[in-house]
């Protein structure tokens, strides 16, 4: 009887761990994914550069495009549209400034970095499995802020390939952008992506 009770308890814990957490608003879900212990946000400091890699759940993109939160059909349409991809925000800062501000006096470095950030991130960033199977980047968005923010922020988009998410984790790497950091590697747990948090729209 005790053994059966223990089994049921373990089963309940497992099911709870695999369930999608649901939040009432964007503030709650944003705070949740910011906490490193929840495995959606990863931070590293290399050679003074603060790297923050954060997964962006599907429903945050749905919410940005949704006008009527009671329109269930529209909600499902937008979820179908966005859940085909995985979205990562990569933030980098040095001396509490965006990266370009730190090379503004060197025209050669400045020009190369502008080119890398605006056009070359598919060559600078990689996502791959422990078996070194690399997933091709679908898109990236770099909004140049002209020194108006204290970090360089890029949204990087990958196809949501189920074969890659069968692994326990995947690697996300950023090549050296000219600050002698070497390759910066993040180990991302896939279970949290599969069971990403959701918003309660109505």
Can you describe what each PLM-predicted range is?
Residues 1-28:
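Bacterial Sec-dependent N-terminal signal peptides
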């Amino acid at each position: 009887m005790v053994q059966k009770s223990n089994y049921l308890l373990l089963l309940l814990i497992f099911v709870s761990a695999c369930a999608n957490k649901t939040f009432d608003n964007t503030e709650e879900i944003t705070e949740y994914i910011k906490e490193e212990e929840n495995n959606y946000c990863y931070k590293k400091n290399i050679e003074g550069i603060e790297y923050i890699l954060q997964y962006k759940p599907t429903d945050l993109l749905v919410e940005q495009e949704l006008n009527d939160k009671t329109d269930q059909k529209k909600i499902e349409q937008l979820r179908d549209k966005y859940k085909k991809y995985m979205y990562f925000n990569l933030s980098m800062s040095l001396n509490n400034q965006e990266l370009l501000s730190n090379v503004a006096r060197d025209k050669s470095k400045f020009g190369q970095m502008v080119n890398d950030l605006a056009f070359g991130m598919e060559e600078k960033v990689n996502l791959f499995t422990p078996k070194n199977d690399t997933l091709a980047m679908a898109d990236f968005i770099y909004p140049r802020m002209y020194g108006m923010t204290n970090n360089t922020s890029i949204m990087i988009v990958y196809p949501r390939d189920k074969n890659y998410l069968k692994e326990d984790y995947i690697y996300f790497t950023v090549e050296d952008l000219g600050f002698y950091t070497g390759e910066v590697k993040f180990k991302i747990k896939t279970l949290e992506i599969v069971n990403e948090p959701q918003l309660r729209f109505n």
